[in-house]
Structures are given as structure tokens and as C-alpha cells.
Amino acid sequence: MWKVASSGRGILKTYVQDHDEDLYRRGMYTFIKRTVPPPTMLMFDASPRDICEVTRHSTNTPLQALIMLNDPTVLEAARVLADQLLKEQTSTEGKIQKSYRLILGRRASSEEIAIMVNYHSKQLEYFGNSSEQAEQFIAIGEYPMEEIKDKVELAALMQIVHTIYNLEEAITKT
């Protein structure tokens, strides 16, 4: 898409992803071609760069769900938060409660905690039976990781955080 809609020559010929510190800059420093904005931004109702918009329309579409489930940015954010939570000496319930506070800005209900604890145990079982899957899952993204003691636990907690990121409340209201 980038190549077809661009002039097809020079440095704008192809999109080149940044790395290291440049990869984690604020969105306002993202290079955007006026004729071809990043598709993810379009899916989440970012205003076009060729006109000024006073209000922004808010939609909720299947493509947004697809992006939230598969985009390396979201998965990497889930991994980094899960890694931070693992360093804390709290119970699984405490880690889930903290992730709700950090992502949604509210405390999780006892029912939500019970559902997530159950899901966490299923993910522990799944990744415990498939350590290769756990390693592939936590390898998404470029953010450096320290030595990981328990890859299965990190992958399971990453799934919990990723699930919270994918709640409608997280996507459209925060």
C-alpha cells in the first residue's frame, strides 16, 4: 500500500520502521505521508492530515479488534507490563487488580478477578504444555527484556494484560 500510493522514488519509496529509542517516540513524531497515513491510525479514527478537523468521530469496528489482537505494538505493551507485574511480590489476584488500575483506571470487581484468575490458570496450562509457544509469544517486539526466570508465567500474565487491553472499555473510553 505504501509503495503504490507514494511517488515510488527516493526515501519515501518504502516505509522503514524505526528501531531502538526512535521506535518508542510519541506519536506526534511519527513520519506520516499525507496521501497514505499509517493504516492503524486510520482504523482508529485519526484525523486525515490534509484537512483540519475540529471533532473526531469515534467508531468501533471489527478491523480495530483485529489490530488490537494482532498488532505487535499492543502485544509488546502487554509483555512489558506483564514483566513489570511479575517483578512485584504480589499474588496473581494482586497483579490482575493492578493491571486493571493501570489500564482502565479502576479496580476490578470480584467477578472480573475470578474470571481472569481462571483464564490465567488455563494459560499457564497451555503455555506449560508448549514452551515453544511461550517463547515465541514473549519474543514479540523489540523492547529489551532482562533475564526471564519463568517464561510460561510471563506468557500467561501477558495474555491477561492483553485481554484487558482488548476490553471495549480500554479501547473506546480510556
Protein language model features and the residues they cover:
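An acidic, gly/pro-interrupted, aromatic-rich
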Residues: 1-95, 143-174
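C-terminal structured "cap/appendage" subdomains that terminate the fold
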Residues: 86-157
